[in-house]
Structures are given as C-alpha cells and as structure tokens.
C-alpha cells in the first residue's frame, strides 16, 4: 500500500523475488510505475557481472632496496563484484598485510592494492613471500610468490610453466618515495589513497 509522507506525497515500494538461477540467467530486469498505462516511468536494472581478478606483483626496485624496510604488494584488478580476500604468507607463515578500499573502474569492475611491509634484510636473504587472493563470487583463488635474487627481481604466479615468467620482463615496481603511487614496467600508473 502507498504511504503518505510529511510532504503530502505518497510513496510505494515493490519487491521482486527471483531465484538465484534466474538472477544469473537474466541480464536485465525492468520495473514500470505510474498512474495510468500511457504514462509509465520505467527503470532498468542490470544484474552485476561476475569477473575474476588479475593479480600483478609489486616488488622493490633496486633504487629503493637499501632502506630499512621493503614493501611488497599485489595489484588486484578487473574483478566484479567488489568482494575480494587477500592474505600474505612468509614461507607458509601468516603475515599481516594491508588491503586498501577498492576503487570502481570505468568498466564497472574494481581494483585494489594490498601491501606488506617487511625488513629489507629478510627480503635480501631470500625469504619467500606469497600474496594469496580469493574472489568468492567467481570461485577464483590464486597466489603469487615473490623472492629476491641477487641482481634481479623475480615474481611468477604459482604454477607457471618453467621459462614462461623470466625475471625483470614482467615484474612491476613499487615506488616508495610516492608511497602508494604505482608505476608498472609498461608505463601504466596507478594512484592509491588510504582511507
């Protein structure tokens, strides 16, 4: 039933319940409202798309590896809806990282960054760090491992065939002097702000 507000205008709501199977099958739902059939207002709803994320590792550039702490990161992009989980491990031991709030991109997918601050000495002696990412809506689960090697930076997705992820060709850089400004090797730049 319609409800009259303080401004003497009436408000009415309607709810459509659909099964999960129908929700996944149909891309659009429409709602029409009005006083008569010739003067209806229509609203159209698009079901949210489900898209799994891309993960890119961020490791210290050689210019910034001499400081007391190093920052490792994961850029997680292109996922929808906004429901992402990230965890960090050092040689299978849980670590406490930071996950920033997701940003909506122009294509209605989302991106975020997670980072872990570690002692530079641990990075230089070759400890292995792993960023684990899961996206429940798409059943996506993956990890990317990072390990320092003298003279090069290596970072390959877990399970990559040998020779498909050569060091220095795919690894982006995290530039510490701008904190959360990320420049990838292809020149693409991302700016992240802490909330």
Curated annotation (Swiss-Prot):
Tissues of expression: Expressed in pancreas, spleen, epigonal organ and at low levels in several other tissues.
Biological process annotations from GO: adaptive immune response
Disulfide bonds: 74-131
Keyword Secreted found: yes
Cellular component GO terms, alphabetical: extracellular region; immunoglobulin complex
InterPro entries: Ig-like_dom (IPR007110), Ig-like_dom_sf (IPR036179), Ig-like_fold (IPR013783), Ig/MHC_CS (IPR003006), Ig_C1-set (IPR003597), Immune_Resp_Modulators (IPR050380)
Keyword tags: Adaptive immunity, Disulfide bond, Glycoprotein, Immunity, Immunoglobulin, Immunoglobulin domain, Secreted
Residues carrying a glycan: 54, 179
UniProt-listed PROSITE patterns: IG_LIKE, IG_MHC
Broad class of the protein's primary localization: secreted
Domain Ig-like C1-type: 53-145
Subcellular location: Secreted
Keyword Metal-binding: no
PANTHER family: TAPASIN (PTHR23411)
Protein name in the entry: Splenic IgW, short secretory form
Upper taxonomic lineage: Eukaryota, Metazoa, Chordata, Craniata, Vertebrata
């Amino acid at each position: 039933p319609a409800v009259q507000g303080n401004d003497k205008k009436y408000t009415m709501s309607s709810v459509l319940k659909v099964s999960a199977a129908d929700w996944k099958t149909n891309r659009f739902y429409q709602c029409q409202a009005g006083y008569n059939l010739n003067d209806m207002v229509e609203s159209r709803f698009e079901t949210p798309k489900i898209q799994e994320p891309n993960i890119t590792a961020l490791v210290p550039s050689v210019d910034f590896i001499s400081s007391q702490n190093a920052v490792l990161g994961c850029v997680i992009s292109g996922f929808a809806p906004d429901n992402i989980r990230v965890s960090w491990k050092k040689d299978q031991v849980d670590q406490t990282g930071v996950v920033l709030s997701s940003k909506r991109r122009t294509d209605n997918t989302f991106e975020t960054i997670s980072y872990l601050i570690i002692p530079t000495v641990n990075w230089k002696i070759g400890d292995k760090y792993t960023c684990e990412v899961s996206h429940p809506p798409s059943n996506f689960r993956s990890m990317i491992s990072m390990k320092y090697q003298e003279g090069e930076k290596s970072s390959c997705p877990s399970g990559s065939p040998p020779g498909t992820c050569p060091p220095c060709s795919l690894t982006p850089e995290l530039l510490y002097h701008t904190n959360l400004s990320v420049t990838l090797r292809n020149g693409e730049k991302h700016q992240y702000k802490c909330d």
